[in-house]
């Protein structure tokens, strides 16, 4: 019995003294944890109870919930009164490419088809060198050059401002790919990631739901043989969900919402003096804004 009491006492002293040492380095934060450490110290060896609760929400969660509410509020309006825009904070982007990977997964993208690459640049002169990361989705231009060159109108600007592709009409001429000044369009050549293995893996046979249509990639069927591009996950937005790249961004650098809603987070962000758009001099009026 005496041995157990000695063990618990030494454990208590160790934890509380450790908190005191940490307080010297971490200030008020460490001091605020002393009550928690006292509870830990007095707990049984095998059972820890009555811990202080975590906060219900952290800041990044609040941002996600706010955008979710913005999207659902926008959907109460007619589509032609919505203007979907994306805002990307370059100071928060860490170049992890989680948005790129999530987009590939959401849209079941094949090799060579990337809707949201992250462009990496090296800035400065050695040894004062840093890296800059720029996610580059489709700009959903207000005046898109791609729609003007399509000979059959397969690519068009939809009511909510998103530039879309009708896979059933697209003939694969690739004029739109050449016309895009942002390099935001790619072509589906019908390849598979697991093409040179004994069989195509099941995950590549899963359907995607681009533009609200369920499709399975199969030879000789769309979207194989079509131009393809980012569409802000239009199929998710119209169901009240956020774009996949927005929800998976580790740095919370990507935002989406209705530009026409003055209460939306994106409307607030684009009022910042830090805002810029790519190649504005071309007159395309891109609907992707960057915070520098």
Curated annotation (Swiss-Prot):
**Which free-text remark accompanies the cofactor?**
Binds 4 [4Fe-4S] cluster.
Provide the primary localization: secreted
Q: What happens to this protein after translation, modification-wise? A: Predicted to be exported by the Tat system. The position of the signal peptide cleavage has not been experimentally proven.
Keyword Electron transport present in the record's keywords: the answer is yes
Q: Which SUPFAM superfamilies match?
A: 4Fe-4S ferredoxins
Annotated positions binding [4Fe-4S] cluster 3: 138, 141, 146, 180
- Residues annotated as binding [4Fe-4S] cluster 2 are 103, 230, 233, 245
Q: Which cofactor does this sequence's record say it needs?
A: [4Fe-4S] cluster
- Residues that bind [4Fe-4S] cluster 4: 150, 170, 173, 176
Subcellular location, in the record's words? Secreted
Keywords in alphabetical order: 4Fe-4S, Electron transport, Iron, Iron-sulfur, Metal-binding, Oxidoreductase, Repeat, Secreted, Signal, Transport
UniProt-listed InterPro entries: 4Fe4S_Fe-S-bd, 4Fe4S_Fe_S_CS, ET_IronSulfur_Cluster-Binding, TAT_signal
Region forming the signal peptide? 1-43
Q: Name one GO cellular component term.
A: extracellular region
Q: Which GO terms describe its molecular function?
A: 4 iron, 4 sulfur cluster binding; metal ion binding; oxidoreductase activity
Enzyme Commission designation: 1.97.1.14
Which residues of this UniProt protein bind [4Fe-4S] cluster 1? 93, 96, 99, 249
Q: Quickly give the catalysed reaction.
A: selenite + a quinone + H2O = selenate + a quinol
Which superkingdom, per the lineage?
Bacteria
Q: What residue stretches are annotated with the 4Fe-4S ferredoxin-type domain?
A: 84-113, 129-160, 161-190
Q: How does it assemble?
A: The complex is composed of three subunits: SrdA, SrdB and SrdC.
Q: What does this chain do?
A: Component of the respiratory selenate reductase complex, which catalyzes the reduction of selenate to selenite. This subunit probably transfers electrons from SrdC to SrdA.
Provide the protein name.
Selenate reductase subunit B
Q: Which organism is it from?
A: Mesobacillus selenatarsenatis (strain DSM 18680 / JCM 14380 / FERM P-15431 / SF-1)
Which gene name belongs to this protein? srdB
